[in-house]
Swiss-Prot record:
Designated name of the protein: Parathyroid hormone 4
GO cellular component, one term: extracellular region
Function: Neuroendocrine peptide which is produced by a subset of neurons in the hypothalamus. Activates the G-protein coupled receptors pth1ra, pth1rb and pth2r with similar affinity. Receptor binding stimulates intracellular cAMP production. Plays a role in bone mineralization by regulating expression of factors involved in phosphate homeostasis. Important for embryonic bone development.
Signal sequence region: 1-24
Family: Belongs to the parathyroid hormone family.
Subcellular location(s) per record: Secreted
Record GO terms (molecular function): hormone activity; peptide hormone receptor binding
Prodomain residues: 25-29
Length: 121
C-alpha cells in the first residue's frame, strides 16, 4: 500500500512537471510572437525614417528658387499707393503711407529670406 502511494505521488509529480514545462513553452512562444511583432514595427519605423531622409534630400536637390531682384517689392509699393489713391478714401498722411510701404516690404523680404534660407558666404 505504501509503495502504491509513492508511485502515485511520483506519477502526480511527473504530470505536474510536464504541465509546468508545457505552460512555460507556451508563454515563450507568445513572447516570441510579441518580440517578432516588435522587431517588425521597429523595422517599419527605420524604413519610414530612411524614406523621410531620402525624401528630404530629394526635395533639397529639387529646390530651384533663385534670388530675384526687388522688382516684386516695387509692385507691392505701387499696390499700396493705389489703395490710398482710390476715390472715397480719406487722404492719409505721408507717415501712414510710409508705414504701409515699410510693412509690406518687410513682409515680402521676410518671405524671401525664409524661402531661400541663409545666404551662402
Amino acid at each position: 500500500m505504501l509503495k502504491m502511494q509513492r508511485s502515485q505521488q511520483r506519477v502526480a509529480l511527473m504530470m505536474l512537471m510536464v504541465v509546468a514545462a508545457v505552460h512555460c513553452q507556451e508563454s515563450e512562444s507568445r513572447r516570441a510572437v510579441t518580440e517578432h511583432q516588435l522587431m517588425h514595427d521597429r523595422g517599419r519605423s527605420i524604413q519610414s525614417l530612411k524614406r523621410l531622409i531620402w525624401l528630404s534630400s530629394a526635395i533639397e536637390g529639387l529646390h530651384t528658387a533663385q534670388a530675384r531682384t526687388l522688382e516684386p517689392d516695387s509692385r507691392w509699393r505701387s499696390r499700396g499707393a493705389q489703395l490710398y489713391s482710390q476715390p472715397g478714401r480719406e487722404e492719409s498722411s505721408g507717415g501712414q503711407k510710409r508705414a504701409l510701404e515699410t510693412l509690406l516690404s518687410d513682409l515680402y523680404r521676410a518671405h524671401l529670406t525664409f524661402g531661400l534660407g541663409e545666404p551662402e558666404k
